[in-house]
């Protein structure tokens, strides 16, 4: 028995027992042979991919180390019911001080590691589907691998996902919803673009077009007085009135145009003739109450002179 163990140890190379590289805690359970690091081993006495080989921690439960070595590993265990990392659990050997390493025997010729790094946490409840495919020689069919709904898992992660990809169908649906949005009537109203203000030579903005001007009481009184005497203003008079009332020429011109339209509207409605009669009556009363000493002309004398 000892010679067999010596044979298996001496054929593993000079760096079989390394300084605890890639080891796991004693309490942690993980894959003994399928979870090998990059320093994997092909059972022909040649290390592949590195100088060390990481194996599983073992716990002593009354089984000798030699018996464990002589027994072949059978990884075709259906662990889908358990759903955690009890995958191929072994017991701890007495040589746990040597980096928790485990030496493969010649009975393990059928085991070929498919990937150097294999995380059990990424498996979830689907451990049973990976048990045989990871230790079988040759390629593994795509049906053994489960698809991930939220992207591809990280190569050396612990169950986390590196990319949370959104399906392209949801993006296309959102774009179609935006394109098919209903168009309401108030969206069809044609709006005039804002008027651009021309900049003067020295960077001073020109006068903006003001829709409505709020005149003061004094300005309205002076404009009404000017309209009473002259319904139409010359350009010189318009400039003078605008300078007196602190307005521009355009404002005075527009006010007179609106005042004339209002006067025509009043005449059509019949309110303007009443105002004329009142003015005539008031002028007649002023003539009767005049202080002149000359008597008024009689109608007979007027008729005789006309003849």
Curated annotation (Swiss-Prot):
UniProt motif Antp-type hexapeptide: location: 183-188
Q: Which family does it belong to?
A: Belongs to the Antp homeobox family. Labial subfamily.
| Residues in the DNA-binding region annotation | 208-267
Tell me the GO molecular function terms. Answer: DNA-binding transcription factor activity, RNA polymerase II-specific; RNA polymerase II cis-regulatory region sequence-specific DNA binding; sequence-specific DNA binding
Q: Where is the composition biased (Low complexity)?
A: 287-307
Q: Gene Ontology cellular component?
A: nucleus
Polar residues biased stretches: 162-178
Where would you find this protein in the cell?
A: Nucleus
Name this polypeptide is given: Homeobox protein Hox-B1b
Q: What is this protein's gene name?
A: hoxb1b
**Function as written in the Swiss-Prot or TrEMBL entry:** Sequence-specific transcription factor. Part of a developmental regulatory system that provides cells with specific positional identities on the anterior-posterior axis. Acts on the anterior body structures. Seems to act in the maintenance and/or generation of hindbrain segments.
Question: Region labeled Disordered — which residues?
Answer: 159-178, 265-307
Q: Which keywords are on file for this protein?
A: Developmental protein, DNA-binding, Homeobox, Nucleus, Transcription, Transcription regulation
Mind telling me which Pfam families this protein's record contains?
Homeodomain
Annotated signal sequence is none
Gene Ontology biological-process entries:
establishment of mitotic spindle orientation; fourth ventricle development; hindbrain development; hindbrain morphogenesis; neural keel formation; nucleosome organization; otic vesicle development; regulation of transcription by RNA polymerase II
**Inducers of expression:** By retinoic acid.
Origin organism is Danio rerio (Zebrafish)
What InterPro entries has UniProt attached to this entry?
HD, HD_metazoa, Homeobox_CS, Homeodomain-like_sf, HXA1/B1/D1
């Amino acid at each position: 028995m000892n010679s067999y163990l010596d044979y298996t140890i001496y054929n593993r190379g000079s760096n079989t027992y390394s300084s605890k590289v890639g080891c796991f805690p004693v309490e942690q359970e993980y894959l003994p042979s399928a979870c090998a690091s990059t320093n994997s081993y092909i059972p022909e006495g040649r290390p592949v991919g590195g100088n060390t080989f990481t194996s599983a921690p073992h716990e002593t439960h009354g089984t000798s180390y030699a018996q464990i070595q002589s027994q072949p590993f059978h990884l075709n265990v259906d662990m889908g019911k358990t759903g955690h990392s009890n995958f191929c659990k072994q017991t701890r050997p007495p040589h746990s001080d040597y980096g928790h390493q485990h030496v493969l025997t010649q009975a393990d010729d059928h085991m070929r590691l498919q990937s150097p790094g294999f995380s059990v946490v990424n498996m979830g409840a689907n451990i049973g589907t990976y048990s045989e495919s990871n230790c079988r020689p040759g390629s593994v069919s795509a049906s053994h691998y489960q698809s991930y709904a939220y992207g591809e898992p990280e190569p050396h992660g612990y169950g986390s996902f590196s990319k949370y990809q959104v399906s392209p169908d949801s993006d296309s649906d959102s774009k179609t919803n935006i394109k098919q949005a209903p168009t309401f009537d108030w969206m069809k109203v044609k709006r005039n673009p804002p008027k651009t203000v021309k900049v003067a030579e020295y960077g001073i903005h020109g006068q903006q077009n003001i829709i409505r001007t709020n005149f003061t009481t004094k300005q309205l009184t002076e404009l009404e007085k000017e309209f009473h005497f002259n319904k139409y203003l010359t350009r010189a008079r318009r400039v003078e009135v605008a300078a007196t009332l602190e307005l521009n020429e355009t404002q005075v011109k527009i006010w007179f145009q609106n005042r004339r339209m209002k006067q025509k509207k009043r005449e059509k409605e019949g309110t303007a003739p009443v105002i004329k009669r009142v003015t005539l009556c008031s002028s007649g009363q002023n003539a009767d109450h005049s202080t002149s000493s000359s008597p008024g002309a009689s109608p007979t004398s007027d008729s005789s002179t006309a003849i």
